[in-house]
Amino acid sequence: MNFVGIIAEYDPFHSGHALQLRMLRQQGASTIAVCMSTGVVQRGGVPILPEAVRVRAALAAGADLVVALPAPYANASAEQFAAAGVHLLAALGCDTLAFGAETPEPAPLQAAAAALCSAAFPAALRSQLESGLPFAAARAAAAETLCPGAADLLQTPNNILGIEYCKAILRQGAAMQLLPLPRLGAAHGTAQTGQVQGQALASASHIRQLVHTQGIKAASPFVPQAAMELYRQAAEQGQLADPEKFSTAVLTLLRTKTPEQLSTLRGAGEGLENRLYAAAREAETVNDLYDRLKTKRDPTARLRRLVLDAVLDVPAAGLPALPPYLLVLGAKRSALPLLKHAKIPAGTSLAGLAGQDQKLQIAADMHSKAVDFSLLCRYKIQPMGHAYTAHVVLL
């Protein structure tokens, strides 16, 4: 293990993330690169803090390099999210992929991934769906018929994402070893807290909830001191995400769309565009919108991502399947020479990358639009064009 990659959101960066970086150093990582969601996040929202703040927090805690997971690939299914992150880290030259998992051994995750990628899986899935099971349950049951034990692995959030990483490595033929790390302290997406090595830990979702209800100081027990200072400054400058502005912006933009426009979106179809069109005209808040769209068939996470795709006009066709560039958001100066060996266009300027060809321009423009939207949803609204003018963070 020499060059370790992590795919993360850092929404926000907290003490659990810092502990993970320390663990990797202790296990022999000489260089750590992070592929971080930018503009938007995988749950179909905007990050609580802007990219530069999260990048500085990660670098201060031990990361060597932070590259962007561009917005259209961040607001995506677990499969697409994982594929994009693996592609970027492999292109950067990482030899190991580290990730949190409830099952800290790679072999069971790899076996489940192989089953999901097998030629026999589509027929097995179809059989389970025809029995009336919802998609997630049908997928787990189908995987179980091909790989005993897979269904249990597909019940826990970190294992689910870990299996998607394994699938991406398998499909892309990426030369990366897997390093699952046990999730320490608080469980993913819960209000539980824990303590490891004398450090209080909480999930990112719990920290976001604390900040939204009690203010930025409430995050202090669960965030490294250096990061906390960055967060205080960001809060004072009005850079925190404002849920009410997000809600208003989403409904405002959705109400300008026609059913025809919505039908061209990524993830639309089967009448979803008509449901979205009708719900947007009745909903009073974005959470009300999600409730109106909800069905037993469609997971809430999928609907949240569809809503954000509609706001950002992400099309069903035209976007490259995988990110076509490596945009460095921040780095220790000693890590910058690694870019010379990248297998896809790499640099510190989005404008410079976008100008190289049409494919890069399309992806960059979609990313820039998402960053602009994110900055519209801050307590203090920021000017447009930030993605193209932002400076790399160097330490």
Residue ranges and their predicted role:
Residues S30, D64, D95:
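Receiver (REC) domain switch/active-site residues of two-component response regulators
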Residues R56-P70:
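A glycine-rich helix N-cap at a beta->alpha junction
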Residues M1-R54:
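N-terminal catalytic cores of NTP/NDP-binding nucleotidyl/phosphoryl-transfer enzymes
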Residues G28, G62, L170-G173:
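A broad structural signal for alpha-helix termini and local helix breaks/kinks
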Residues A68-L395:
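Active-site cores that bind ATP or allylic diphosphates and position pyrophosphate for catalysis
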Residues I7-A8, V41-Q42, A58, P72-Y73, ...:
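Short, contiguous strand/loop micro-motifs
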Residues R25, L59, L89-A90:
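Non-catalytic positions within long, well-ordered alpha-helices that form the structural scaffold/packing
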